[in-house]
Regions:
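Membrane-embedded helix-loop-helix hairpins and adjacent transmembrane boundary segments
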Residues: 1-319
Length: 319
């Protein structure tokens, strides 16, 4: 994987993305179909995907709600925890749009993928990617809900709780195991390719930022293009070694929380400040670089303070 990125750069990442997304979509629809037929068959409705979907709506209607109900004094701790993860309509008014606009619009790792041969190509690519994103509830969420319903009703006991230890992260793989052998292998290969492509994009982004914004700007302003490419490749190797060191013996303390959850928590400390800096920089001409840095630092400090002091003060109170 590392050798491929070092030798190929964004060109390899682009080709890999195109291939793996096609396979992922096909495998995703196949997994959803299998999940829904498993539900319908378990409830004696035959192998009917539509009947399986209707059964999900009947059995677990709250899993299809966009807004989680606010907990009451009689609510269980599980219900409170779910609400804290998706805290009502306030999340949509004051949280998600900031995180999403920051991730999709102010993140070099993402914006580098939107570059095209011309403006029209770039715009078309972004719109097409947005359309594919709309498929996520079908190919990702439905199999997870199906696994939940099946487990709750006595199925998938061994798959979801190997050795008697329940793990919700096993939901998708539990459904994936029922795919035909060829499709199962294809889906696993696509998932692996997606992971590799994602890591490749991050590594390339790290190399670009260090080479162009740090090395070429402050360390060697007259560096040739050939030297910059060499520095970029060295940066990729160093970043991969550093990442391996941090994963050794769980140095970051991620534990069983999962890497994605861990990363989202801590990037959330800086995303509001970064987004505000970009927003003001685009629409207010009097914004300066110093003001942007000050806003970024202030936003980070406020986020850390809110994370530490707001939960004990407000508990699950929001609107």
């Amino acid at each position: 994987f590392s050798v491929i990125i070092i030798l190929g750069g964004m060109k390899v990442i682009g080709f890999t993305d195109v291939i793996q997304v096609v396979v992922l979509i096909i495998g995703g629809f196949a997994t959803t179909y299998v999940a829904l037929t498993l539900v319908s068959d378990h409830f004696g409705l035959g192998k009917d995907a539509l009947a399986g979907f209707k059964q999900l709506m009947v059995d677990s209607p709250k899993h299809f709600n966009l807004i989680v109900d606010k907990p009451t004094e009689q609510s269980t701790q599980e219900e409170i925890n779910k609400y804290l993860m998706l805290p009502g309509i306030g999340m949509y008014l004051a949280g998600i749009w900031i995180v999403n606009l920051n991730y999709w619009g102010c993140n070099q790792y993402i914006t580098q993928r939107a570059l095209g041969a011309d403006l029209k190509t770039a715009r078309t690519g972004i719109l097409f990617a947005g359309f594919l994103k709309l498929l996520m509830p079908i190919i990702v969420m439905l199999p997870g809900i199906a696994a939940y319903v099946l487990y709750k009703n006595g199925a998938l006991q061994e798959e979801m709780a190997p050795g008697g230890n329940f793990n919700a992260d096993n939901a998708y793989s539990a459904i994936l195991g029922f795919l035909p052998n060829g499709m199962k292998g294809l889906s696993l290969a696509a998932l692996t390719a997606a992971i590799v492509a994602s890591l490749a994009g991050k590594a390339n982004s790290i190399a670009t930022i260090f080479t162009m914004d740090i090395y070429n700007k402050y360390m060697d302003k007259n560096a040739s293009e050939k030297k910059l490419i060499k520095i970029g490749k060295i940066t990729i190797v160093v970043s991969i070694i550093v990442s391996l060191l941090f994963t050794w013996d769980d140095l970051l303390g991620i534990g069983g929380a999962g890497g994605f959850t861990f990363i989202q928590k801590y990037t959330g400390f800086i995303s509001p400040g970064v987004f505000a800096m970009f927003l003001l920089g685009m629409f207010w001409k009097r914004t300066t670089g110093s003001a942007g840095i000050a806003g970024l630092i202030t936003g980070f400090v406020l986020s850390v303070c809110l994370n530490k002091y707001a939960p004990p003060r407000f508990r699950h109170e929001t609107f």
